[in-house]
Amino acid sequence: MSPQTSKPAKLPFWRTVGSAYAMPFKHADTLGHVTWLWLGLMTPVLLLMSWIVAPLVTDIMGKIGTLAGRDVHWQLQMLSFVKQIVLLPAVASIAVAWHRFILINEQPNERYLEIDRNVMLYASYVLVTSVVLNGIGHFPAYLAAATGIKWPDWAVGIASVLALPLLLIVARYSPILVAIALGQSDISLGDVWAATRRNTWRMALGPLACIILLGIPGAIMFHLNGMNRLSAAAVLTLLDLISIIGGVVGVSFLSLTYRHFFPMKPHIRMQAVVAPV
């Protein structure tokens, strides 16, 4: 399987985003099979983590918008990153199953809880890119926290600017995640880069458009300051669970994007349907 090398077709942006939003609703039963056991296992873990960090998060959110808030913003980013690492095995497993369902109609079993080689490779790729983006974008803040030397605002701005082109590159390469999920080792990073040429902004803004609605329930974090520890922990846990389910929209976008640039051959789909379980 290889992409069109002459002139890559432009991704139909809004149609793809709309289809990505429709997928979880259209296949809600399958989504339930993919997620319910993982969510059940992760809920107590998330609740424990949220209980531990709730006082710190509440304090940070209370300082947002103040001068003190500028110095603690990196702490909120770090806490978010740590939670992402904890969630990564579950999220990667769910994403791989969802990719395979959308593209090759592979039906997950009702007690889906799988971590195989594809899931590990998927999670590793996400982890590496996240560490690089997070490290470069917040390098001045992390270095200041480690050394006690406060960096000027222009240095923080430069770090953010440097992270932007890297973010665009990561977006262009993102369909490789789908190839990993499908176990298609014949698709290389070079193939993905060539196939997505002239689609950089679509690849970058597509996932953003698919997760932007998650900011609506996230607004409740600004009210954590008035909650007790248990309530704050419950809210943080609920937001994490919503983000996992809502993130499936972004996974759907990647699947549809991959199908656009790398059309699936009929015999591949048929093999997936009749393959023994």
Where are these regions (language model features)?
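Alpha-helical membrane-spanning segments of integral membrane proteins, especially the hydrophobic core
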Residues: 76-84, 109-138, 155-163
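Membrane-interfacial helix-loop-helix connectors in multipass membrane proteins
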Residues: 145-158, 225-237
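Nonpolar helix-loop interface/hinge motif
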Residues: 1-54, 163-232, 243, 267
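Membrane-helix interface motif
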Residues: 48-65, 134-147, 220-226
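Interfacial transmembrane-helix boundary/kink motif in multi-pass membrane proteins
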Residues: 27, 31-35, 104-130, 191-194, ...
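Juxtamembrane transition segments at transmembrane-helix termini in multipass membrane proteins
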Residues: 2-3, 56, 60-77, 86-90, ...
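Residue-level signature of the transmembrane alpha-helical core
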Residues: 35-39, 81, 85, 123, ...
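Specific transmembrane helices
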Residues: 46-54, 79-104, 125-142
